[in-house]
Design a protein with these regions (language model features):
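A conserved helix-loop-beta module that forms one wall/lid of the active-site cleft
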Residues: 43-122, 138-147
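Short catalytic/ligand-binding loop motif for oxyanion handling, primarily in non-cytosolic enzymes
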Residues: 73, 96-99, 115-120, 128, ...
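Generic beta-strand structural signal
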Residues: 102, 175-176, 247
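C-terminal active-site "lid" helix and adjoining low-complexity regulatory extension at the edge
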Residues: 45, 247-285
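Short, flexible loop/turn elements at secondary-structure junctions
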Residues: 92, 113, 162, 175-177, ...
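Phosphate-binding site of ATP-dependent enzymes
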Residues: 130-211
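A long amphipathic alpha-helix within ATP-dependent nucleotide-binding catalytic cores
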Residues: 151-155, 195-254
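Membrane-proximal basic amphipathic "stem/tether" segments
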Residues: 1-60
């Protein structure tokens, strides 16, 4: 059986030396493969992300600091207040800690040093210790050479299921020069992932990114103005960044801060969506 391109890519990642030259080579090949074009110096969505990833900006100490899902809460507390943080129940530093720990019957369990990994525990269901053990053995840098993850310490954070829900809507707000510019809404992430995009006045936009455009309506949050203020305050410490929020219409909680959305390889549907999104984000100061 011939190995897949994905398998060959992972082998190449393991074999290439871990340095910035090879990191940038991987970024270039990944960008070329995803977008079928060379990266440019233009203010286009993925090109700006590519430049963040391939320059010293991705290693800015603050960007590295907020990549850790435990430490980002210290930043959020300092900038917008601890009331915007999801409460922390526990932080576990080893599998020994995990095996000794009595997990709450309902909780959210996730690694602080990875992305896209989460276990939602309900009604005291058994916790998958093998999956958590894999987290401790994983380094997200080795997946796609995002250098801000390279030296993060493996940990697991335990949080409550906020708003008593395991199917929250993610509001991802793209900020540029300290202002909220574009809103991405992720729905049914753990069922049938789909997305919608809105401007800051909650007008729906005619494109999606990576996932299908959601068909079901998404109501404007009652506290949208507060959400935009929180995102802008946090985003003011970066050039271009994504601030992820959860809300029940009253409270506004920060999920994470993302430096390089989609590793700069997610594609728009239709293709013209990238120019529209880019003009909304970068086209005005």
């Amino acid at each position: 059986m011939k190995p897949s391109l994905k398998t060959l890519y992972r082998i190449a990642l393991r074999l290439l030396p871990e340095n910035r030259v090879c990191d940038n080579l991987v970024a270039f090949i990944t960008f070329l493969r995803a977008h079928r074009r060379f990266p440019t110096d233009e203010l286009l969505f993925n090109d700006v992300l590519y430049r963040i990833k391939t320059t010293g900006e991705i290693l800015d100490p603050l960007r590295v600091f907020v990549s850790d899902k435990e430490f980002v809460k210290l930043f959020v507390k300092a900038v917008v207040g601890d009331e915007c943080n999801v409460p922390t129940i526990a932080v576990l530093y080893s599998m020994e800690d995990v095996r000794r720990y009595q997990f709450p019957s309902d909780c959210c369990i996730k690694p602080t040093h990875l992305t896209g990994k989460v276990v939602l525990r309900r009604q005291s269901k058994p916790v998958d210790l093998e999956e958590i053990d894999d987290w401790f053995k994983s380094n997200h840098y080795h997946v796609n050479r995002e250098a801000n993850y390279k030296n993060l310490r493996p940990k697991v954070i335990v949080e409550p299921l906020i708003f008593n829900s395991d199917s929250l809507i993610d509001y991802k707000i793209f900020c540029y020069k300290g202002r909220a510019r574009l809103i991405q809404v992720d729905v049914d992430r753990h069922i049938e992932h789909a997305r919608k995009f809105f401007d800051i006045n909650w007008n729906e936009l005619p494109f999606s990114l990576l996932y299908p455009r959601a068909t079901r309506p998404v109501e404007r949050p009652r506290n949208l103005d507060k959400m935009l203020t929180v995102a802008s305050s946090l985003g003011s410490h970066f050039g271009f960044v994504r601030v992820d929020l959860y809300t029940n219409g009253e409270e506004c909680l920060v999920g994470e801060i993302t430096n390089c959305h989609g590793n700069a390889w997610e594609t728009f549907t239709p293709d013209s969506g990238e120019e529209l999104a880019s003009s909304m984000i970068f086209g005005r100061d």
